[in-house]
Curated annotation (Swiss-Prot):
Ranges for the WD repeats: 234-273, 278-317, 320-359, 397-435, 471-509, 516-562
Gene responsible for this protein: RRP9
The protein's name in its UniProt record: Ribosomal RNA-processing protein 9
Keywords: Acetylation, Coiled coil, Nucleus, Phosphoprotein, Repeat, Ribonucleoprotein, Ribosome biogenesis, rRNA processing, WD repeat
Residues found modified as N-acetylserine: 2
Keyword Coiled coil: yes
Annotated PROSITE patterns: WD_REPEATS_2, WD_REPEATS_REGION
Length: 573
């Protein structure tokens, strides 16, 4: 383990002599470190005082106290919104030459206060029920997004995971004056060359700042052939996935060496190694349950494993897929959604009930073509039905595998496939309720020289087979902002696409594109900062030259290894 800013030790010269009298070692510290220590001591003292103050209260008093505190927080938020509105109005009035008061400017502050509190209560109830309650898709200023790209030294980033406090109401300016980790946001990346790296992403106006890294290698190859003894404290094969715990204490990695490693986020030192104990148990994806220590792992041996990270133990194994479980997603409820690659199914696992729901995909081009022909058929004057020519039909591609998944809320999720499909699913229906085909476009046509060596142009065109050799861009990454109507998709088409789900959760449409993501998008994450209703969103994506699970994608134009960042603001109304 090594810090980026590690200093070399000064060698002692021959002329230096140890002092005869015993002396006390002195530590050279800067004022900021003393302030941090004082802040930590004061925080501990405040925590002890609060524990002593409420030591004798019964459960009913505790519930009453928490309810009062909750209402006070709502009132303070409402007051903040009111003061902001009044300041904005006063500023507008000062800019006017003639100040006139009309019916629009006359409002009751008390009624507005009640409306704000009522709307917040509705949002909290919707969040507890696990339903979408954040509708800010129309407010995003995507065209004004501030984009940046950070080059990294690792080869082919495979995943990125971000840590954000549960109630993050801090800005960068506020957090820089207090505790060094209070309200801070961190990102963790892993790569095919066995490196785990930690970044500070708190300041949205700056690029991610590299803090620490941990490197694996051949020295961690176990000497024993038994899978249950695969407990060396480091990775010796490609790291494919990473997940940061919601409490910020741990970060978990997994990969082709068939084990999970739990790392301390402070020092990036290994805390616990948990082997999958299966020769095919490569860990492909990880997801933490929201505000919990429960971890879900999807593996290449067709199984889903659940863990309790605070106890460093495996809880149970879930069976059902018929191919590798390529991706997994989870939110607040004790359930997760997985996709099984070439078995073309998505499964929702209700873990407490020990049941699952199976959702089947699999587009068939011939059926889709026949359906399109029937929908566009016209009846002639003689009553005969005339079908359009097949050359006029749009391109339909066979769905070979479902590769990525992300939960929108506890009752809806989205999936991405290798034929460019993005599908919206509901638990009430076994088939997708809406499908966007060829979401990221079609790959460029192969040239004549790549297909045929014939000199005759007619023969070469015949061997090119018209449109049959065209292929779509795969959907390599999806991320839905939890409980909202916005999600982001990625491929290797050179841009990320931002989509908005309709208010009735029955369809979605394209909001805009974020250009500059040159390479294969292997993972997307979103963090946010700011007051309620005025959040600023930062989209982070790990970009690589290869697909995270193989080397099928080659020669991507302008591809680079790095972290893509885009900061998006909201309109104030």
């Amino acid at each position: 383990m090594s810090d980026v800013t590690q200093q070399k030790k000064r060698k002692r010269s021959k002329g230096e002599v140890n002092p005869s009298k015993p002396t006390v070692d002195e530590e050279i510290t800067d004022p900021s470190s003393n302030e941090d220590e004082q802040l930590e001591v004061s925080d501990e003292e405040d925590a002890l005082e609060s524990e002593e103050e409420f030591e004798g209260e019964n459960p009913a008093d505790k519930r009453r106290r928490l309810a009062k505190q909750y209402l006070e927080n709502l009132k303070s938020e409402a007051n903040d919104i009111l003061t902001d509105n009044r300041n904005a109005e006063e500023k507008d009035l000062n800019n006017l030459k003639e100040r006139t008061i009309d019916e629009y400017n006359n409002f009751d502050a008390g009624d507005l206060d009640k409306d704000i509190i009522a709307s917040r209560l509705k949002e909290d109830v919707a969040e507890q029920q696990g339903r979408v309650f954040r509708y800010f898709g129309d407010k995003l200023l995507i065209s004004e997004a501030k984009q940046s790209f950070t080059r990294v030294g690792e080869n082919n980033l495979t995943c990125i995971s971000c840590f954000q406090p549960v109630l993050n109401k801090y800005t960068f300016e506020e957090s820089s004056n207090g505790d060094k980790n209070k309200g801070r946001l961190f990102a963790y990346t892993v790569s095919k060359d066995l490196q785990l790296t930690k970044y500070d992403i708190t300041d949205f106006s700056k690029r991610p700042k590299k803090l620490k890294y941990a490197k694996g290698g051949a020295k961690y190859i176990p000497t024993s052939k038994h899978e249950y003894e695969n407990t060396t404290e480091g990775h010796y094969d490609e790291i494919l996935t990473v997940a940061a715990s919601p409490d910020g204490k741990y970060v978990v990695t997994g990969g082709r060496d068939r084990k999970l490693i739990v790392w301390s986020t402070e020092s990036l030192s290994p805390v616990k190694v948990i082997p999958t104990k299966d020769r095919r148990g490569e860990v492909l994806s990880l997801a933490f349950r929201k505000n919990s220590d429960q971890l879900y792992a999807s593996c290449a041996d067709f199984k889903i494993r659940t863990y309790s990270i605070n106890q460093f133990s495996q809880l149970e194994i879930l069976y059902g897929h018929h191919d590798i479980v390529e991706d997994i997603s989870a939110l607040a409820m004790e359930r997760c959604v997985t996709v099984g690659a070439r078995d073309r199914t998505a499964m929702l696992w209700k873990i407490p009930d020990e049941t699952r729901l199976t959702f089947r995909g699999g587009d068939e081009p011939q059926k889709l073509l026949r359906r399109w022909m029937k929908e566009n058929a016209k009846e002639g004057e003689d009553g005969e039905v005339k079908y359009p020519d097949e050359s006029e039909a749009p391109l339909f591609f066979c769905e070979g595998s479902i590769d990525v998944v992300s939960m929108v809320d506890d009752f809806h999720f989205i999936t991405g496939s290798d034929n460019g499909n993005i599908c919206l699913w509901s638990l009430a229906k076994k088939k997708p309720i809406f499908t966007e085909r060829i979401a990221h476009g079609i790959l460029p046509e192969p040239s004549f020289n790549d297909i045929s060596g014939e000199t005759d142009e007619e023969l070469r065109k015949r061997q090119l087979q018209g449109k049959k050799l065209l292929q779509p861009f795969w959907i390599t990454s999806l991320y839905a902002i939890p409980y909202s109507n916005v999600f982001i998709s990625g491929s290797w088409s050179g841009s990320l696409k931002v989509w908005k789900i309709s208010d009735n959760l029955r369809s979605f449409e394209l909001l805009g594109e974020l250009s500059g993501a040159k390479g294969v998008v292997t993972k997307i994450q979103v963090v946010e900062s700011g007051k309620h209703g005025k959040e600023k969103f930062r989209i982070l994506a790990s970009i690589a030259k290869e697909h995270r699970l193989g080397r099928w994608i080659a020669n991507v134009s302008g591809a680079r290894n790095g972290i893509y960042s885009a900061v998006i603001d909201q309109t104030g109304f």
